Amino acid sequence: MQWCTGAQFTKSITTGASNDGDDSYNSDVIIKRQDQLSYPAIIWCREKDFDWYLPSQKELVSIYKLIDLLNKRGINLHNKWYWTSQEDGGNKAYSINLDQDKPSSLHKFYHNYVRAIARF
């Protein structure tokens, strides 16, 4: 799934989704935008329910550290690239490969995995 659509990517828009906290701030920033439908990864997470959102780098690294335990419990995370909610300027956003714990800045129109998380 794309972080943003190819059409949105060509506009090189910076959304302000740059928080690395443990909350839905970045997703909330994008949901409030009039062009929110141009951000499929965030929309997909939010469509699960209002409490669901795309995790920050910090939150996704925490998931990475628990990947073996989560997979044993049936969560089925793959050692693939997953989007975080944090952008890196107008054309890139951070993604983490779950076989390592270091984020990389990738073009927003790339297709990566998405893992929604919820507040509790």
Label each residue range with its predicted role.
Residues 1-53, 57-66, 120:
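Short aromatic-cysteine micro-motif
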Residues 37-38, 47-51, 57-120:
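C-terminal, surface-exposed recognition/capping segments
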